[in-house]
């Protein structure tokens, strides 16, 4: 199906989505009712049941679908290669977070409720409504509408649904190693992110990477009495404090030598679009009781959190911290430190540079141990890519607002895995809202997000169709 043919079907496809929204919602409710909590071994049968449910739905749509075992929870793989033109891989996850604390839920977490709101919106309240079952099904239901109207999809589609995203996807990298050739596509589509706001869709094209390190400073061979050894003995807490203080520059940058090697400036076009976004720097910080940005001076808050690397201290441990007072010089002190990375930074080179920086600050009679807590590289989608351009256009048509090109200060290891192992870029297109309470009691997904999410994917599939028949 070429783009002209897809365009002739699109209005009927969108009408089909609207006419069948109740049936789509019923299917979502069926999936939500399966308590596929991946972290709890007691729910392993439920994870398998959710995978089988998805396989069945895909099979009914004409996908060649199968459930693939892993060391823990199964993958669901489906292919519909009957279409022409580009080949996309859609990724989602069927596992959910635990519901604790159960007492804070207003209703059964696995019995979805439609809750009308004063503003006219309706919330779908249940665990997994937003993260990620509701989001995942927006794509499946868009495929269903295309099949019902046109008999086929406008493009070639593969899907990968996993059941371990909420536990950091331990089975995904080895699965990609063995199944990568089958899953290789022109682009990955991920529906597990937020819109910019309730009316403005967004495509996330950049994710920061992360490097997590723990350092342990050892000095004396036992804890010491400060009245006897103070001044004469090295205090590892002081050594650690000096190291931590040395990591940042006065203007908010990172002082590790070579840290910014390979880091490039944000394109002017992206800076200009971010400046047009309705974002309030003062409000962003005011919500958390702060008022002054702490990152590199001369850069906007969005640039600081989306497009610049950072260093954060997450914990300092050592000495006496219980009630009362104890005048001890501890034998050891430790800290947990992470670096958010951007495109152009190699996590292993940053690790080496950080460790060299720390070693340079270790005095005689003291030693340091490093504990590696993992790392992943940043990912960036080319801003002039055809898939991004077409997706932005389709989203803008559906929402009647210019779709935003967004970044994310966080890290999604699966996106790095798709890039590193299969060489595939990812477009992150989600319809959640910042107030959806994912991972918290009373998680919700807006009914309008579900409906317009389905319509958005229907438009994107049409937009991706090739130009000529």
What are these regions (language model features)?
Residues 2-102, 332, 336, 349:
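N-terminal helical capping/dimerization or prosegment-like subdomains
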Residues 16, 27-30, 57-61, 145, ...:
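Generic non-transmembrane alpha-helical segments
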Residues 38, 339-342, 369-384:
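A short beta-alpha structural unit
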Residues 85-161, 452:
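Active-site metal-coordination/substrate-binding segment of hydrolases
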Residues 154-234:
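Histidine/acidic-residue-rich, glycine-tolerant segments that coordinate divalent metal ions
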Residues 205, 226-316, 345-367:
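Acidic-enriched catalytic cores of C-N bond-cleaving enzymes acting on peptides and small amides
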Residues 216-218, 240, 307, 325, ...:
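Zn-dependent metallopeptidase/amidohydrolase metal-coordination segment
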Residues 242, 318, 323, 327-353:
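C-terminal catalytic subdomain
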């Amino acid at each position: 199906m070429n783009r002209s043919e897809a365009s002739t079907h699109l209005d009927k496809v969108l009408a089909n989505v609207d006419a069948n929204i109740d049936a789509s919602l019923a299917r979502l409710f069926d999936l939500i009712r399966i308590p596929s909590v991946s972290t709890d071994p007691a729910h392993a049968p439920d994870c398998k049941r959710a995978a089988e449910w998805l396989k069945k739905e895909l099979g009914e749509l004409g996908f060649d679908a199968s459930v693939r075992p892993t060391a823990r929870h199964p993958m669901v793989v489906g292919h519909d290669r009957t279409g022409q033109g580009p080949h996309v891989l859609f990724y989602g996850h069927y596992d959910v977070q635990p519901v604790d604390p159960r007492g804070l839920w207003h209703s059964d977490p696995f019995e979805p409720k439609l809750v009308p709101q004063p503003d006219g919106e309706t919330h779908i309240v249940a665990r997994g409504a937003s993260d990620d079952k509701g989001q995942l099904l927006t794509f499946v239901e868009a495929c269903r509408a295309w099949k019902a109207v046109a008999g086929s999809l406008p493009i070639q589609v593969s899907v990968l649904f996993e059941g371990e995203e909420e536990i950091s996807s331990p089975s995904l990298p080895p699965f990609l190693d063995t199944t990568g050739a089958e899953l290789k596509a022109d682009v990955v589509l991920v529906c597990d992110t937020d819109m910019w706001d309730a009316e403005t869709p967004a495509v996330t094209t950049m994710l920061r990477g992360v490097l997590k390190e723990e350092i342990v400073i050892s000095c004396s061979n036992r804890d010491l009495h400060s009245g006897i050894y103070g001044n004469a003995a090295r205090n590892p807490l002081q050594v650690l404090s000096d190291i931590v203080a040395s990591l940042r520059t006065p203007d908010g940058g990172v002082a590790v030598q070579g840290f910014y090697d390979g880091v490039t400036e944000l394109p002017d076009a992206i800076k200009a679009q971010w400046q047009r976004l309705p974002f309030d720097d003062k409000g962003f910080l005011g919500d958390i009781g702060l008022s002054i940005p702490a990152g590199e001076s001369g850069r906007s808050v969005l640039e600081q959190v989306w497009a610049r690397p950072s260093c954060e201290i997450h914990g300092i441990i050592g000495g006496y911290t219980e009630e009362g007072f104890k005048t001890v010089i501890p034998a050891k002190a430790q800290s947990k430190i992470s670096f958010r990375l951007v495109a152009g930074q190699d996590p292993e080179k940053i690790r080496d540079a950080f460790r060299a920086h720390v070693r340079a600050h270790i005095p005689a009679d003291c030693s340091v141990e490093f504990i590696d807590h993992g790392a992943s590289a940043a990912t960036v989608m080319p801003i002039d890519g055809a898939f991004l351009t077409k997706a932005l256009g389709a989203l803008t048509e559906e929402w009647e607002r210019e779709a935003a090109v967004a970044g994310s200060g966080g890290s999604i290891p699966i996106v790095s895995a798709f890039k590193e192992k299969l060489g595939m870029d990812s477009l992150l297109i989600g319809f959640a809202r910042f107030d959806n309470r994912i991972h918290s009691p009373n998680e919700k997904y807006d009914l309008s997000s579900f409906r317009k999410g389905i319509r958005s994917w229907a438009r994107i599939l049409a937009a991706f169709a090739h130009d000529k028949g």
